[in-house]
Amino acid sequence: MATNHLVLSGTITRSRSFKSPAGIAHSVIMLEHKSQCFEAEMLRNVYCQMQVIFSGERFESVTEQLKSGVDIEVQGFIALQQSRNGQNRLVLHAENVELKT
């Protein structure tokens, strides 16, 4: 079995919550990540934005806290998602989240 696990920290810039037609609670956020990493012995500024999806009852206790400006660390798996206009993008499906204070 192939490995698919990502850990990413950052600041929430957007959030929304909804229930699927099956009644499953979902929260979707945009996570903005900024860091510095070494690559080829050079310090590199790293920046990305990634959509993160929180699904199911286990995240209901933190849903109210997933608001713009909150710093979090999230662990999960990435998957391809196609938007209505046909654009493909990677999204992170959360398996664990830690609020940073």
UniProtKB/Swiss-Prot annotation:
The keyword DNA-binding applies. GO terms for biological process: DNA replication, synthesis of primer. Residues 1-101 form the SSB domain. GO terms for cellular component: primosome complex. SUPFAM superfamilies: Nucleic acid-binding proteins. The keyword DNA-binding applies. InterPro entries: NA-bd_OB-fold (IPR012340), Primosome_PriB/ssb (IPR000424), Prisomal_replication_PriB (IPR023646). It holds the Pfam family SSB_1. Keywords: DNA replication, DNA-binding, Primosome. Transmembrane segments: none annotated. GO terms for molecular function: single-stranded DNA binding. Gene3D superfamilies: Nucleic acid-binding proteins. Belongs to the PriB family. Homodimer. Interacts with PriA and DnaT. Component of the replication restart primosome. Primosome assembly occurs via a 'hand-off' mechanism. PriA binds to replication forks, subsequently PriB then DnaT bind; DnaT then displaces ssDNA to generate the helicase loading substrate. Involved in the restart of stalled replication forks, which reloads the replicative helicase on sites other than the origin of replication; the PriA-PriB pathway is the major replication restart pathway. During primosome assembly it facilitates complex formation between PriA and DnaT on DNA; stabilizes PriA on DNA. Stimulates the DNA unwinding activity of PriA helicase. This is Replication restart protein PriB.
